[in-house]
Structure formats: C-alpha cells, structure tokens
C-alpha cells in the first residue's frame, strides 16, 4: 500500500509525470539491493530469522514514520527521499529471511511450489494493505474537508473582498478554485500522513509480537 500512495503523492502533489515518479523510486531499489546482500551473508547467519525479521519490520516502521512527516511544504529531498531509502533497507532485511524461512526444510521438488505460495501470500498481504490504507485515507480526507470547509469559505470571501471581485466573476471563480484545490491537497496529504502513522503502529505491534513470542 505504501508504494501506491507514495506514487499518488509524487504525481498529485509534486506534479511528477509517471516516468519521473518511477525514477524517483530508484533510491529505494538501490537501498534494497545494498541491504539484502549483507543481510543474507552477515546479518541472517548471526541473528537468525528470530532476530532479523523483527529488525527489518522495525526499520520499515521507521520509514513509515518518516513518510508521516509529509506536509504541503515538504520537498522530495526532505521526506520522500530519506523515507524511500529507509523503506528499501527494511525490505532488504525482511525479504531474504521471509523467503528463506518459507522454503527452509521443504523438499527440493516442492521448492518452486513453496516459493509460489510465498509470492501469492505477499500479493494478498499487499492487497489487504492497499484496502486498509484506502479505507483510512478516504475517510480521513472526507473528515478533513468537512472540518475545514467553513474556514475555506471564509477565506474565499475575504480574498474576494480584498480583490473586489464577485463570486460569479472570473476573478472570484479563480479564487474559489484555488482555495478548493489547496484544501483538497491538504486533505490528501493529511490522509496519507495519518495512514503511514497507522501502518507504523501496526508494524510496531508485529515487532512486539515477534519479540515476545519468537519465530521459528
């Protein structure tokens, strides 16, 4: 779910094209690769799955907390870039141990089947994540617009009075449209920020469960 809403953030807030939105995710991919290699060779042999998976989830939770700091004034370098790097590091820690644990002890003839099941589970989990984020973001954005509608209306009336423009005049319509667009932008970013905070808490809970109960 994080990737989808980060893409929306890049395109809707920054005005990036689909191509540029894909390019700005490259630091995440590089961080994933740079972390996965030492994770498989050094971290997993030392900590085992019991230690590496909670560590990776904690790093992912940290990336969501970074994303949750986004505001209408945030730049790509201020929030998105560091968040993407940390997110890639978290994926680099969790992916090797997840697939290794999922196929460990499986007969060689059934390794392909086990990998397919893991991939399917990953896709299903991603779908649930998207559904959860969508539900939260939609409701949060609607609530934000409702709570701030009167404030925006008052700001529009004040701006039209200063500009000596009527609501139906071209200048008045431009003022209204500008303030409405700003309200929608703020509502979306507030929704995304809250959604990332929620996901960080969910992952923190998962880390706590893994640490307390242990994993195989």
Language-model regions, residue ranges each:
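Hydrophobic transmembrane architecture of multi-pass small-molecule transporters
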Residues: 99-101, 105, 117-215
């Amino acid at each position: 779910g994080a990737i989808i809403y980060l893409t929306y953030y890049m395109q809707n807030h920054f005005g990036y094209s689909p191509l540029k939105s894909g390019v700005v995710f490259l630091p995440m991919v590089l961080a994933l690769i740079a972390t996965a290699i030492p994770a498989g060779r050094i971290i997993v042999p030392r900590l085992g799955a019991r230690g590496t998976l909670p560590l990776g989830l904690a790093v992912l939770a940290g990336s969501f907390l970074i994303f949750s700091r986004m505001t209408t004034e945030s730049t790509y370098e201020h929030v998105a870039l560091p968040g993407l790097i940390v997110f890639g590091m978290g994926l680099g820690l969790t992916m090797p141990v997840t697939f290794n644990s999922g196929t460990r002890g499986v007969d060689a003839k059934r390794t392909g089947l086990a990998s397919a099941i893991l991939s399917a589970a990953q896709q299903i989990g991603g779908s649930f994540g998207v559904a959860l984020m969508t539900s939260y973001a939609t409701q949060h954005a609607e609530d934000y617009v409702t709570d701030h509608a009167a404030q925006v209306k008052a700001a529009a009336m004040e701006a039209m009075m200063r500009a000596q423009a009527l609501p139906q005049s071209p200048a008045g319509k431009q003022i209204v449209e500008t303030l409405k667009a700003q309200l929608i932008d703020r509502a979306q970013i507030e929704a995304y920020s809250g959604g990332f905070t929620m996901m960080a808490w969910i992952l923190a809970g998962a880390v706590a469960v893994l640490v307390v109960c242990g994993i195989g």
